[in-house]
Amino acid sequence: MNLEKEIKQKAFRSEQSKLIVNLIYTYNQLKSRIATVLKKEGVTMQQYNVLRIVNGAAKEGITTSEIRERMLDKMSDASRMVDRLESMELLFKQRDRDDRRVLHIYLTDKGQSLVKRLMEQETIDQLASGVNEESAQQLNELLDAFRASL
């Protein structure tokens, strides 16, 4: 179904206007579907993003400032989220051996188990299953170019 029918709008002023509305509408649908999966596991999208980032750092660990740089939502408070995930026993902090001011953050066994479970049931790949590899690559390139123009 095309956007006009889904949101019951007759016409857009321009293709660029339609693009903006289409991006927002699509984002909201994706966010809702992903949030439903995460809610069942007791984490928010921002918390899952932190867990995903820490998981990517693996054995080396990662600092809060590095997490902040990699977050999808730049407005999120990474320090507060790390503390919350630590209280949920999903992360732990360890002081750097050489520089005691630096804290490295790691997944606990419980955190690793949760990330693994979420990656197995994560709907992201399934949500994009209607788009072939070539089209996905083209869309990614277009979105990269669009984001660069902002």
Task: Identify the role of each PLM range.
Residues 1-11, 134-150:
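C-terminal regulatory/oligomerization modules of transcriptional regulators
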Residues 1-41, 90:
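N-terminal leader segment of winged-helix/HTH proteins
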Residues 18, 22, 49-53, 113:
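Pre-recognition alpha-helix immediately N-terminal to the DNA-recognition helix
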Residues 28, 32-74:
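N-terminal helix-turn-helix DNA-binding core of bacterial DNA-binding proteins
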Residues 83-138:
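Charged, amphipathic alpha-helical coiled-coil/dimerization segments
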